[in-house]
């Protein structure tokens, strides 16, 4: 892989990792989906989390395209397809977002993705 392309990919992976860490940190106090739905701060947290999930999913799609689908298969422990699919659901069906799914992804799936920069460097 060309050096400048490799640097760009590592930079983007770091941005994804930072966004994932923010999602995890910002949702530490959210224990159940009711924490999203029953308070104004909870709804704001859900909405901001969805925006970051869109950004992460879009960045992953870009990485997949820019690496000719060669990078993501090297890390099968990450649910890449799920991350890209969640981005599509949030972006195109925003009013049908399931807070339970968002919370589950943040609590269960994102910790693996948060190690991405270390995995790929």
Residue locations for each model-derived region?
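Solvent-exposed interaction patches of small proteins and small membrane subunits
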Residues: 1-121
């Amino acid at each position: 892989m060309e050096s400048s392309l490799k640097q760009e990919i590592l930079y983007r992976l770091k941005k994804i990792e930072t966004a994932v860490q923010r999602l995890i940190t910002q949702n530490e106090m959210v224990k159940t989906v009711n924490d999203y739905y029953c308070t104004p701060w909870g709804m704001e947290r859900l909405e901001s989390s969805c925006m970051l999930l869109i950004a992460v999913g879009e960045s992953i799609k870009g990485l997949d395209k820019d690496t000719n689908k060669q990078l993501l298969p090297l890390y099968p422990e990450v649910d890449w397809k799920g991350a890209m699919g969640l981005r599509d659901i949030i972006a195109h069906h925003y009013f049908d977002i399931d807070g339970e799914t968002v919370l589950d992804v943040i609590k269960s799936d994102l910790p693996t993705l948060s190690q991405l920069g270390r995995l790929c460097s």
